[in-house]
């Protein structure tokens, strides 16, 4: 049996959790918070991990895993280098998608919306809360650019450690946060026999409305 044939045979049942129109919250942010509280109790690894998808100038989609670092006023916040590939793509096309997947609970959340930078004050506050070596790494890494080798990065990091010691570090201007302002959010609950639950929220003017989608 080939490896590809065996891959086709990999499957599992998802259990008894469910999501109905009646049990769903009226707005998706309340529903997300409700699910996320459960996730923090049940997911062992990286509960804040989310796939961020953007589109480059050629129209090619691009995805990577980033970490959710805030949910403020209904907006999803993450941080990155403003000169990275994702930042360049966002600059040209300020729309993105997020995908959360929590396998222990067989739950998935998909988000689509507009992207904009958060305030410098917010970025400063988060940057100063990071471990010191993580702050140094943000300074020395020219994210998404070709580098000679890993040793050069480590040497630059060690040099900064010697230079700064325990002194406060100023956030570099090319590093900070983005918020995704959602226009659509879908909640997916895995069910047995592949008859999954899907509740899709979308903006209707200034209000949210939701509907059930077929799996």
Swiss-Prot record:
Its EC number is 1.4.3.5. It catalyses: pyridoxamine 5'-phosphate + O2 + H2O = pyridoxal 5'-phosphate + H2O2 + NH4(+); pyridoxine 5'-phosphate + O2 = pyridoxal 5'-phosphate + H2O2. FMN binds at residues 64-69, 79-80, 86, 108, 143-144, 188, 198. Substrate binds at residues 11-14, 69, 126, 130, 134, 194-196. Keywords: Flavoprotein, FMN, Oxidoreductase, Pyridoxine biosynthesis. One of its GO terms (molecular function) is pyridoxamine phosphate oxidase activity. Catalyzes the oxidation of either pyridoxine 5'-phosphate (PNP) or pyridoxamine 5'-phosphate (PMP) into pyridoxal 5'-phosphate (PLP). This is Pyridoxine/pyridoxamine 5'-phosphate oxidase. The gene is pdxH.
């Amino acid at each position: 049996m080939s490896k590809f044939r065996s891959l086709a045979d990999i499957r599992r049942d998802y259990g008894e959790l469910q999501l109905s129109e009646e049990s769903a919250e009226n707005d998706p942010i309340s529903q997300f918070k409700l699910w996320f509280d459960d996730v923090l109790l049940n997911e062992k690894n990286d509960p804040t991990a989310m796939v961020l998808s953007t589109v480059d100038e050629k129209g090619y989609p691009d995805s990577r895993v980033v970490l959710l670092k805030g949910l403020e006023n209904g907006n999803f916040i993450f941080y990155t280098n403003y000169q990275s590939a994702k930042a360049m793509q966002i600059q040209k096309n300020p729309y993105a998608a997020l995908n959360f997947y929590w396998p222990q609970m067989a739950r998935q959340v998909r988000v689509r919306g507009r992207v904009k930078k958060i305030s410098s004050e917010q970025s400063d506050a988060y940057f100063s809360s990071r471990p010191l070596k993580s702050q140094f790494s943000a300074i020395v890494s020219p994210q998404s650019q070709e580098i000679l080798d890993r040793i050069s990065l480590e040497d630059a990091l060690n040099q900064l450690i010697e230079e700064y010691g325990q002194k406060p570090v100023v956030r570099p201007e090319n590093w900070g946060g983005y918020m995704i302002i959602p226009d659509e959010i879908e909640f997916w609950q895995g069910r047995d026999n592949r008859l999954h639950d899907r509740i899709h929220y979308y903006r209707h003017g200034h209000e949210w409305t939701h509907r059930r989608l077929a799996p």
